[in-house]
Amino acid sequence: MTDAQIALLPDRGVVQVSGEDARKLLDSIITNDLSLLDKQDAIFAGLLSPQGKILFDFFVVRDGDGFLLDVARDQAAGLVKRLSLYKLRAKVAIAEAVGAQVEASWPTAAGSVADPRHGELGGRRISQSPVAFDPGAFEAYHAHRIALGVPEGGKDYAFGDVFPHEALFDQLSGVSFTKGCYVGQEIVARMEHRGTARKRIVRVTADGALPVMGTDVLAGEVVIGAMGSSAGVRGLAMLRLDRMVEFAGKGVGLTCGGVRMVPDAGDVARLAPKTAG
C-alpha cells in the first residue's frame, strides 16, 4: 500500500455546533442532508444567502451530541455569527473550536475520514495535535485537488458571488435535492431542474504559469470567465460555458493574463448547460 501524504492546512478552522437542537438547526439551513452522517463519516455542504449564493462552504462531521464544521479559517468567525442569527431560542452552542487544526491526506490516512467531494481526493482529519506545517506538502495537496477538478471557496470563487451549481456543489455531493427546505433552496432547485447553470468551474491547462485568482479569462477580446487557483500550468477557472462553446465554434481560443489556455474537454462536455449548442 502506498504511504499517505499528509498536509497540515493552516488556512482551515473549525466551528463547533453542539446541544440537543444542533442537528435540527443545521439541517434546516445548510445545503446537504445531515442524515447522510448515519452512513458516512463526513459531508460537504454550504450555507447560502436567501438569494441562493454561497456564503460559506464546509465539511460536517459528528462530535458527540453535536457537530464540527471544517471551514476556511478566515470565514470561521463569520460562520459563528451567521449561525447564531438562526439560533433564536434553540438549545445550541456555537463557537470556534480553539486549537483545532485540519489535515488532508492522500490516500486517506488512518484516523482520517474520506473527503466526500471526490473518491480520489483522500481524507481529512480534525486534530488538536496535527503534523507540523510543511509548505511543500500544502502545495502538493492543492495541486492534487486542482488536478481532480475540485474547487474551493476563497481560492476558486469568492464567497457571496456564486451559486452552488457554479461551484460544482451538484458534482461534489454538496447539495441534497431530496431533503426539506433550507436557506436559498428554491433557487438551487430551479437551477437543477432547468439545467441552466451557464457558469461552471472547469480544469484548464495553459502554455505557461497561470495568473492569480480573479484574472479575466478572454475569448478573443470578450471576458467569459475568471481564473481560480492554479499549480504551474494547470488550474481551475470559472467560465461561461455557453459563450465558450460559441466562440470555440468560431475557432476563437482562450487566454488569461496573456497566457493561452485550453479547458478540459471532458469537463466542458459534462457541465455545459442544456441550452448550449
Where in this protein do the model-derived segments appear?
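Short, conserved active-site entrance elements at the starts or edges of catalytic domains
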Residues: 138, 144-170, 207
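Glycine-rich, small/acidic residue-mixed loop/short-helix segments
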Residues: 167-173, 189-277
